[in-house]
Regions:
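Post-transcriptional modification and biogenesis factors for structured RNAs
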Residues: 1-238
């Protein structure tokens, strides 16, 4: 599994005490506009890993880009990309930098992605009509963490995902159209389910430790010569 991030992930993957991150955040914030840092603090407070998204072999860059933007806009911190048929390639003109704020985890097979997600305690929720499907209104977000899986543009959800899915979800249709494209479907489902989390009693936010680790990475993304600054002040070895 590969993790995509502009900022070096080496230190982020090592467990550090919350105080370690907070000390460096406080120092780096001195090199930022106060308004910018306040915005980051606000956004981190609304981030979640309780819900995540998985894209299976997304061919079109515009759809990959839209998925990244949807996740960022609605506070979903992680996006999982299965890439055994094609790479998950976002269009820079569409994402407009939002990929800096979302962690994209990449997998070479569906089995690898499912094993990781199941190992992290996620329910696999396939976005496709099914005999036992649910709608955003009827889906129970309180049953535990869940991952929304979106299939490829033409074939939809793969047989491998259909076999291991814990639940299925669809968007009710009332016209002649029987389906929406990946981007539209993702926007509706992600927004609807995030709204349910915000309105419910589920503890969906990041832990204090996760929030500090993420804010540390974001402040590093936003400060020029962050490595030099941290090395000079804290003696960091990158």
């Amino acid at each position: 599994m590969k993790v995509t991030s502009k900022c070096s992930m080496t230190m982020a993957n090592i467990a550090k005490p919350k105080e370690w991150y907070d000390e460096r955040i406080a120092y780096l914030s001195e090199f930022m506009l106060p308004e910018r840092f306040a915005t980051m603090q606000r956004v981190v407070a609304d981030r979640t890993r309780y819900m995540t998204v998985c894209a299976e072999n997304t061919f079109h860059p515009q759809n990959a880009s839209a998925l990244v933007r949807h996740c960022e806009a609605f506070g979903v911190q992680e996006l999982h990309a299965i890439e055994f048929l094609c790479g998950f390639q976002a269009n820079l003109h569409i994402v407009r930098g939002t990929d800096k704020w979302v962690d994209i985890k990449r997998y070479g097979s569906t089995a690898e992605a499912v094993a990781h997600l199941k190992g992290e305690g996620y329910r696999i929720v396939a976005a496709t009509p099914h005999t036992n499907d649910m709608t955003p209104d009827s889906f129970d977000v309180s049953k535990g963490k869940f991952c929304l899986v979106f299939g490829t543009e033409k074939q939809g959800i793969s047989p491998e995902i259909m076999e291991v899915a814990d639940e299925f979800i669809k968007i009710p249709m009332y016209g002649f159209v029987e389906s929406l494209n990946v981007s539209a479907c993702a926007a509706i489902l992600i927004q609807g389910l995030v709204e349910k989390l915000h309105c419910g009693e589920v503890d969906w936010r990041l832990s204090p430790e996760e929030s500090s680790e993420l804010l540390y990475r974001w402040t590093r993304e936003s400060v020029k010569d962050d490595e030099g600054i941290l090395r000079k002040r804290f003696g960091e070895d990158f």
